[in-house]
Structure formats: C-alpha cells, structure tokens
C-alpha cells in the first residue's frame, strides 16, 4: 500500500497541471505537513466542497508514516492530507476506500478538515524511506486499476502499482486500461518493493516526489514539486491535501470505477466545485490539491490531462510566476479552478486529470523515451515501463491535438484524452484553458521556460522526456479507464468531437504507409493533422503540440528517431520513420484529423499520416521531397528540439506557419500531401532515390537521372567512368538506339558501358580509385559518347551487339581515359615537385599508356574499321575483335594499375609508402648466385628458367583470358537483360 501511496503521489504529480483557476485559493494556507500520526484533517481550504472525497477521503498510507498505511481508511478525515500523497491507500485501505461510495467519501471529505494548501506542496513525511519503485507507469497502473479494478482489486492494484512502477508501467497502463487487473495487482505487489526510495530534500514526500518516484521523471523529490498543483513554492513545507489527490485518483478512481457513476452522480459535473473540493480547485479555493486533481471530473480530467500536459506548457507557464520561485512548483491554471471544478466529472476523471500531465510524462517516459532513449526514460525506465507506442502516440496526438485545438477546439486538445479515453468533450472552459495553455506551451517551448516553470532544468527533461510520456500515457490509459467507467457518454461525445476512430488511427499507425500509398491518404487533412500533431520530423514536431510536456514528448519521440534513428535527412521528411508513424503520427493523425489535421499539416509538421498522404500522392513526392529537403536540416533540430524543447516548439511553430514547407515524410516515400508548394522543388525528390521510393513525378521529371543513376550503378563498376558514364550513357542512348524503350535507351548505353566497364574492371580490376577517377580522371566512358556517334549501333538490339562500332566505342573510351590520366599526371608533375622515384613511376605509367594508345590501340582501331568494312578482306569477325580486345585489356589493366598506384601516391601527397610486399622483397636476399657451373649446365638452367617463365606467363594469360571471357559472357547477359532491368527499376520506383 505504501508503494501505492507513493504511486498516488505520482498522481499528485499527474495532477501537476493545475486547473485554470489558481490551484490554490491562496498560499494563505501553508502546506500542511501533516505528520503521519496527525489526522489528515482537511484544511478548511479543502472543505466538503471536494465532491470527490475519495482523494481526500482515502488516506494515502504511503504518505502516512508506516502507521498511516495501517490506520483505518475511515480515518479519512484525519488522514486526508497524507492520503493525497499516497495515490492509493494500503490495499486494505484502498480497497475499502474504493469500496466506499462516492457519497460516503464525500461525507468523509466534508468531515475532514480540508487543508486548502492545495497541491502547492504535497510533502508528506518520508518517515519511511520507501523505495519508490512506482514509476509513472506503475502509478498509471494503479490509477487504471483504481479506476477499473481498484474498487474490486484494490490490494492487487497496490501490489500492481509497485510492479507497474518497476516493470510494466507501460504495459500495466495499457493492460490496466484494457484489463486493469492482474498487472495492476502485480505492479502493486512489485510496487511496494520496487518503489523507489527517494530521498526528498525536505524529507517529506511531496506530490512531486510521488510523481518523481512514480513518474521517474519526477524522481527528484523536491524538484518534483513542479508537479505539485499547489502553487506554493515551499517545497520544504510538507503539504498535505486533505483529500489525497492521488488517493482520489487511485481510491476515488477505484471507487469511481465502482462509484464513478456514484461519484459522478453524487457530485454532478454541474457542481464542479463540489466535485472539486478535493481539487481544492473548488471555486472557494484557487489551489488545487493533487487529491483535488484526482477529484477532477472527467472534463477536468481532460482539461487536466491536457492542461497537465499544458501544465508543463500552459499551467507551468501560467503558474510560471508562481512556479519559478516555488520549491514545489504549484501548477496554477489561470483559467481558475472554477473551470476545472465546474468541469469535474468524477474522481476517476479527476484521477485522469491528475494524471493529465502525467500522460505526457508517461508518454515521454514511455514510447517517446523508448524511441528517444530519453535520459528521463532511464530515470523512470526501471520504475515505470514506458507507455506503449500507442499510449505515447495517444499522448502525442493528444498533445498535438490539444496544441492544435487548444485555441481552436477543446476537443482536439483532448485528442489525447480522446485517444486515451474518448469519453468526454472538454467543456468550453477547457478551450479557453487551451488558449491560455498554448501561450504557456509556447513559453514552455524554451527549455528555459520549462525550467522556469519547473524550476529545475533537470526535472524538465525528466518530466517531459520520461515521466510525462509515461504518466501521460498512463494517464491517458487511466483517463481512458476513468472516462470509460465514469463518462462513457462523455466518451462518446469526445469521440464525436474527435471525429476519429481510435481504432482507425491505431490501424493507421500500423498501416500508415499502406494507407498513404493505397488510399493516397484521402485524409490529407488527417495526415496534415498528423504532420501538425507530430511536427515535422524536424524540430517542428512540437510546433503544433505546443503543450511542451506532451509536445516535447512528441518531438522527443520523433527526435527519438535520433535514438531510434531519426531517419536520414530525407527520413526526417519521412515523418513515419522518424515519427514512429505507427504511434504518435497516427495518434496525431487521428487527433489532428478531428480539428487540425489540415492546420497542423500546414504547420509543416510531418507525420506518418503526413507521409501517408505523401505516399498516397506520389506526385507530391517531388513536393514532399522538396519540402523535406529544405526541412531535412530540421530533423537535427528535431533532435535539438528534444534537447531544447522550446527550440523545437519554436521550429514547429515556424513550420506550422510555413505550411507549404510541411515535411511529408511518407514512409520511405517523400510526398507532400498537402503542400503543393514543395512541388516547386522536384529536384530534391531525386535525392530521395536513396530512399528507394521515387514518386512517379520525380521519375518522369528525372527519369534520365534515374537511369543515369542506374547507369552509374553499373558504371560504378568502372568508377573511372563517373562523369563520362553519365554523358556516355546518354550518348549511348543514341548509340544503343537499338534499345526500343526510352527507358532502355538509358539502359542500352549502360549496357555497353557496363560491358566495357565490367571488362575494364575485370581487366584492370578498377585501375583507379573511384574518387580519384571521378575527380581527376577524364570522362570514364568516352567510348560511350562515341557510341552515340555510331549510327550503326541503333541497329543493334538492346544488347548493343559487339561489332566494330561497339569496340570502337570501347577503344575510344579507353583512349580518352588513358589520355586523361596522362594529362592529369603531366599536370601533377608540373605542379608538384615529385621525387625521382615518383617521377619515374609517373613517366613509366604515362609512357606505357601513350605507347599502348599509339600502337595497340591504333592496331585495334584498324581491325574494327575492317570489321565495319564489308569489302574488307579478310574481314575480322566480332569474335576476332573480342579476342583482340581481351588482349588489349591485359595491357590496359597493367597501365591502369600503374595509374592507380599514382593516384594513391597523389592521395598520399606523393609520398612513397613502401608496401609490406615490397619491403619483404627488398628484405629477401637476392637469389644465391649459382656457383659458376659448367657452361652446358648454365645454358641448360637458362633454358629451363626461360621455359618456366614462359609457361607461367602463358598460364597467366590463359587465366586472364578465361576470366575475361567469363566476364564478357556475364556482361553480355547483363547487357541483354539491361533493358528489362532498366525498365524494372523505374517501374518499381514509380510504383513506390
């Protein structure tokens, strides 16, 4: 139960986001450091108004000293403050408490003096240095269990809480959300032992501490105070909220699960103040205790959820004035507790609300951290399993939706809530809160703002990176549970408001790419919303989700791509890849679908749905490619956004402003769904060839370049033909006019170059380094160019048959290549003061090349001309030409090796590097001079030596010729199939 209690404190942190109203009526009431023995006399601040007495009613045994965990649940009056700290009473307590009807809890709450210190500082004596194994995930489980199972499985929930915190925060959350049961139990069981023992600076458990322990991101106890709804900064002041925020979240949610209807009914949403008494957000109180947060109704839960996300963003910013100085950053929502309290639906909602901020944190600790390898994830990783990508996606989408629609619509902001628990549309107040929230989130965009709001930069990463992910994800799940049980109708309303099918967006996650390609992303606006929701893979990802906590999660999530691997620069455009299109992108997609899919997409945010859109709209690829190109640098900002959330948010915002630049990173397909503007830059699309997905537009516009690239691939065999291979391949198109297909036109030239190049490679074995050849060598395949000049070539079918023209082309290419090498070496000798040895090598290579060109090349040229002359007698056949060419290849290979060595020397600043072989040879003693034998013996030995040398040379030549013939056969077959290959590649890319 203590573990649960700690989890509860996490709820406190969950409720970190304050309601719009000042969470605390005023710091007039100092945080009550209720000793565990001290009855949790509710402060007057939290009078019976807390309609959700569950929080306050349920003693947070964890918060209470060890005895407090044992004190009867009925001691709610006395223990309410501490219970706030304890998210969940001890199993027995929690179970009993949860079993208490909402009315009973309300009565208890009323009976108890409510400390209206608010959540300012839920500092509970840490008499028990409890291992706070509860992580956001674990608390999430507790909340879910409380919401759905705690009333029935309070003990198991508590046990589960520990587990959740330690192990399956994410799983537990998801499972708790779906079957808040066994895992909750397991977590409660493991939670106690796993609970992190947090040494709070004050020595008291603060709501932040609870959050920290459970949120992981909020582990820093005092710093955790940041999550404290109470504005009061006295971190050292232990504050007990008479209605344990977490208790209500957990216990009330548990009871709420049972009595959610009861709680909701007894404290009807219309009387949010009554429902909010626990909130302390009641109209009478500006400070909302965590308990009150948990008490927040579903509407408040939505608000809180989003606001809690915003709490980091808006609430923190709004409470920034309060927070900056606060030891415990009391998140104060300018909107006023009234809105929140008025929107209160049920303790469960309150719990969800309490978790509102935590979903983001949970998300951050969860999928986001997973993807990002967030430091926060490390903090809370052990304590709380990270929320599943879905949860993270939900939270992200929620954040994005909230960001997008905070100003525009409250529901979109609730997208996360909707995604998590599509149970209620936020009240109109919530939108106003969202509006406030947006500025806050904007302010929070800067990590400085965040640190200001939270007072600890270190906390911020934790909050945003991990706890928010985990907690927000958990809260999302918990919120789902609470909303489901408490606000099914609100859920339907929210679903309607969402206009999203949660399943669909989940499906879109898994099938976003297919959807984009197949459906063409008819939901451009959805994809746009995804883009906006999940800002462009670059920093923009946060732009729409101004809610820094959640948006930073999103950004981090996408940035996580860096950890996950942000895609390449082009991939950043591929929001899906970066964005975990399966998760946040789709959540975002659904969310933004509702309200801001278009707006968000305009915001330049690219989501998986965005990429889906781009995928579906291959023509947009050019735009997408173009757009991503400009934004390709942004992906680093995206990571930067992870680093500096404000920066990311800023980028996102700027992206949102530049809708046309929206990065459409369809999965592997760069397509700009919504932005025709990116079409302006079709050239970048070609850049995406590396992606392997080329949109038809790009292919059509850059088909030659594609074929060129293919050619280059083939030519890459002969790296020396880099530049000229393109030219020659283009020229070879005419040369190989025989290739009927325009595509194969490129292919044809490639085929010829391929053959020649392949032969060349085989013969010279890549005589020169690709880099050297590309930069310093003459056009690699001039022969290909000559092929264009040979009109007879077109007659040849696709294979560019090897006749005189073919070999003349090869000869011309080789001649130009060798001449280029010679010229290059001449320049080098003139420009550089080469050593005699190097100069000798240069002269040797150049002389050999010139000799080869002047003699053998000329001879071969004559043979080729004879072959082309039908009247020639004898007329050499193609086989004769091929055989002679193979012989030439031996010489060309030797010369190529020499030039290759020269280029290596050049790369080495013309410094001779003795190879081990040479050294060995030098070291090897000269062969012993045979003693002068008889002349006859000497003659015999000479004959034998000459014979042996001749045999070796002949064998080597035979091997070379055999290898060359085999290579020639391979080249021929490749050339013959070049057309189909060439056609196939473009088709495949076009299909993509």
Curated annotation (Swiss-Prot):
An individual GO BP term: modulation of chemical synaptic transmission
UniProt lineage: Eukaryota, Metazoa, Chordata, Craniata, Vertebrata
> Species name for this entry?
Rattus norvegicus (Rat)
Q: Which UniProt keywords apply?
A: Membrane, Methylation, Phosphoprotein
Q: Does the keyword Transcription regulation apply?
A: no
Q: Does the keyword Membrane apply?
A: yes
Instruction: Please list the tissues where expression of this protein has been recorded.
Output: Expressed in brain.
Phosphoserine: residues bearing it: 206-207, 377, 380, 384, 388, 405, 415, 421, 580-581, 609, 611, 665, 744, 973
Q: Where in the cell is it found?
A: Membrane
Chain's role: May play a role in the molecular organization of synapses and neuronal cell signaling. Could be an adapter protein linking ion channel to the subsynaptic cytoskeleton. May induce enrichment of PSD-95/SAP90 at the plasma membrane.
Identify its protein family. Belongs to the SAPAP family.
Report biased composition (Gly residues) as residue ranges. Answer: 162-171
Gene this protein is translated from = Dlgap4
Molecular-function GO term, any one: molecular adaptor activity
| Pfam assignment, any one | GKAP
Residue segments, region Disordered: 1-31, 154-226, 342-435, 527-665, 677-751, 763-798, 915-992
Protein name per the record: Disks large-associated protein 4
Residue(s) carrying Phosphothreonine: 915
Biased composition of type Polar residues is found at 199-208, 399-413, 576-591, 969-978
């Amino acid at each position: 139960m203590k573990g649960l209690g700690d989890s509860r404190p996490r709820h406190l942190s969950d409720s970190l986001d304050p309601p719009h109203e000042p969470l605390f009526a005023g710091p007039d009431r100092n945080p009550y450091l209720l000793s565990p023995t001290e009855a949790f006399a509710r402060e007057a601040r939290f009078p019976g108004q807390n309609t959700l007495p569950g929080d306050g009613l349920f003693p947070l045994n964890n918060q209470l000293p060890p005895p407090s965990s044992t004190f009867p649940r009925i001691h709610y009056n006395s223990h309410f403050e501490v219970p706030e700290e304890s998210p969940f009473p001890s199993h027995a307590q929690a179970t009993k408490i949860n079993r208490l009807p909402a009315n009973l809890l309300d009565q208890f709450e009323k009976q108890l003096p409510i400390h209206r210190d608010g959540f300012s500082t839920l500092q509970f004596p840490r008499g028990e240095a409890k291992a706070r194994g509860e992580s956001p995930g674990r608390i999430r489980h507790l909340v879910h269990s409380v919401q759905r199972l705690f009333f029935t499985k309070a003990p198991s929930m508590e046990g589960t809480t520990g587990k959740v915190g330690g192990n399956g925060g994410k799983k537990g959350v998801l499972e708790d959300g779906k079957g808040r049961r066994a895992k909750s139990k397991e977590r409660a069981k493991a939670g106690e032992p796993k609970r992190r023992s947090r040494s709070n600076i004050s020595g008291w458990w603060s709501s932040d501490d609870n959050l920290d322990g459970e949120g992981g991101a909020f582990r820093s106890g005092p710093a955790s105070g940041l999550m404290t709804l109470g504005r009061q900064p006295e971190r050292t002041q232990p504050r007990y909220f008479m209605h344990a925020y977490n208790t209500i979240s957990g216990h009330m949610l548990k009871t709420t699960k049972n009595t959610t209807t009861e709680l909701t009914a007894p404290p009807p949403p219309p009387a949010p103040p009554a429902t909010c008494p626990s909130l302390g957000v009641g109209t009478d109180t500006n400070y909302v205790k965590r308990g009150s947060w948990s008490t927040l109704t579903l509407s408040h839960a939505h608000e809180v959820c989003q606001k809690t996300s915003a709490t980091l963003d808006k609430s923190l910013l709004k409470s920034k004035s309060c927070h900056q100085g606060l030891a415990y950053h009391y998140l104060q929502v300018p909107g006023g507790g009234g809105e929140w309290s008025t929107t209160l639906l049920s303790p469960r909602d309150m719990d969800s609300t309490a978790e509102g901020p935590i979903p983001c944190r949970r998300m951050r600790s969860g999928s986001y951290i997973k993807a990002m390898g967030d430091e926060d994830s490390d903090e809370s990783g052990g304590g709380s399993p990270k929320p599943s990508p879905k949860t993270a996606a939900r939270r992200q989408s929620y954040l994005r939706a909230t960001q997008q629609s905070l100003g525009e619509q409250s529901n979109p902001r609730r997208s996360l809530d909707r995604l998590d628990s599509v149970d209620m549309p936020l009240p109109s107040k919530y939108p106003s809160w969202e509006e406030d929230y947006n500025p806050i989130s904007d302010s929070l965009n800067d990590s400085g703002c965040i640190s200001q709001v939270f007072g600890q930069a270190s906390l911020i990463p934790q909050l945003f990176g991990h706890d928010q992910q985990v907690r927000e994800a958990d809260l999302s799940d918990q919120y789902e549970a609470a909303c489901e049980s408490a606000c099914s109708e609100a859920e339907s309303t929210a679903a309607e408001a969402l206009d999203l099918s949660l399943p669909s967006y989940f499906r879109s996650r898994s099938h976003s790419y297919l959807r984009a390609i197949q459906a063409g992303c008819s939901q451009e606006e959805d994809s746009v919303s995804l883009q906006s929701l999940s800002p462009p893979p670059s920093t923009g990802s946060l732009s729409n989700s101004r809610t820094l906590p959640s948006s930073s999660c999103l950004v981090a999530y996408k940035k996580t791509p860096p950890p996950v691997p942000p895609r390449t620069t082009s991939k950043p455009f591929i929001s899906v890849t970066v964005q975990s299109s399966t998760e946040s992108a789709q959540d975002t997609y659904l969310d933004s679908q509702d309200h801001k899919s278009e707006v968000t997409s305009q915001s330049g945010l690219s989501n998986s749905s965005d990429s889906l859109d781009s995928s579906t709209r291959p023509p947009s690829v050019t735009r997408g490619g173009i757009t991503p190109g400009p934004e390709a640098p942004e992906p680093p900002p995206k990571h930067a956004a992870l680093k500096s959330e404000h920066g990311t948010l800023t980028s996102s915002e700027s992206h949102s402003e530049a809708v046309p630049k929206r990065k459409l990173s369809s999965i592997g397909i760069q397509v700009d769904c919504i932005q025709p503007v990116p079409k302006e830059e079709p050239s970048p699309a070609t850049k995406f060839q590396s992606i392997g997905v080329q949109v038809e537009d790009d292919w059509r516009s850059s088909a030659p370049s594609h074929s060129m690239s293919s050619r280059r691939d083939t030519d890459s065999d002969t790296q020396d033909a880099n530049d000229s291979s393109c030219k020659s391949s283009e020229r070879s198109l005419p040369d190989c006019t025989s290739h009927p297909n325009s595509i194969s036109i490129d292919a044809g030239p490639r085929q010829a170059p391929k053959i020649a190049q392949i032969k060349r490679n085989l013969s010279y074995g890549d005589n020169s380094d690709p880099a050297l050849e590309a930069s310093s060598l003459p056009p690699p395949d001039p022969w290909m160019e000559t092929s264009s000049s040979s009109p007879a070539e077109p007659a040849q079918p696709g294979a560019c048959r090897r006749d005189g023209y073919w070999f003349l082309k090869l000869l011309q290419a080789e001649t130009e290549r060798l001449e280029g090498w010679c010229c290059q070496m001449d320049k080098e000798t003139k420009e550089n003061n080469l050593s005699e040895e190097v100069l000798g090598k240069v002269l040797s290579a150049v002389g050999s090349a010139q000799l080869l060109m002047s003699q053998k090349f000329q001879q071969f040229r004559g043979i080729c001309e004879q072959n082309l002359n039908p009247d020639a007698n004898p007329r050499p056949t193609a086989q004769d030409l091929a055989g002679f060419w193979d012989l030439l290849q031996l010489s060309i290979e030797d010369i190529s090796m020499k030039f290759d060595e020269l280029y290596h020397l050049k790369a080495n600043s013309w410094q001779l590097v003795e190879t081990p072989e040479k050294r060995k040879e030098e070291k090897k003693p000269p062969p012993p001079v045979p003693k002068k034998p008889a002349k006859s013996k000497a003659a015999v030995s000479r004959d034998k030596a000459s014979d042996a040398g001749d045999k070796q040379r002949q064998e080597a030549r035979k091997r070379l010729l055999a290898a060359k013939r085999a290579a020639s056969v391979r080249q021929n077959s490749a050339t013959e199939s070049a057309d189909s290959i060439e056609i196939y590649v473009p088709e495949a890319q076009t299909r993509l």
